[in-house]
Amino acid sequence: MGILLYPTISNLWNEYIHFVSIGHYEETVTELDTAEIDRLMAEARDYNANHTKNVIMDAFDDDNQYVLTHPYDTMLAVDSTGMMCYLEIPKLKEKMVVYHGISAKVLERGVGHIEGTSLPVGGESTHTVMSAHRGLPSAKLFTNLDQIVLGDQFYIHVLNEHLAYEVDEINVVLPEETSLLDIVPGQDLATLVTCTPYGVNTHRLLVRGHRVPYVPPEEPTVTFWEKMSELKFAIITLLAVLLIADIVFIVFRVRRKKKKR
């Protein structure tokens, strides 16, 4: 039973961690004074102004020896958790923490912002790129990213700003094909990257969006506590199946004993 429930329970635990982390982030941002928020945002925009070319590192390369650099590791940091912002994908009913960099440790627990790409604060001639795994037994993350279609939106919540991006390109490329992640002069872009095909991981799925006005979704993203009902349903269903199996097994044994007599 434990083996059967492991993916569901571990994923819900990961979502709980994201839920708590996002709540802590929002609370921390609320407690910051306006001057500090303005400083962090100005610092990030200055960084982007001096960053004119994206340099892409493959987050899913087994030989990835990525190490955070300074001062990148302090950009948009409101505390010492390594959290940069959080990503919301209404279509998938998911909210995910975005951390600095793409180390193996980061990608085991959340979304990683690829250092070498624009910081996720928007603006002309910027292109921020974020990566996450598919199919981790312990976390859903970008597992269902292939369900996104043109016209869908995703949001980046950073400090006290909410950036909306509408998907305008979906591409599948080889890991070394990174030209689609370049900065496009005058455009404000964001791309989500994961492995594909599912379980094979020889290519990369790129879901790109361009900046549009942010309008809060009419249907709010499902909260962790609402998702707990999924776990209850899974447990009840599994218990029912096991109960039926036990009954069938007992009936079978009783009939078998009667036949032997």
Label every model-predicted segment.
Residues 221-261:
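C-terminal single-pass membrane-anchor helix
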Residues 1-231:
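Solvent-exposed, non-transmembrane regions of membrane-associated and secreted proteins
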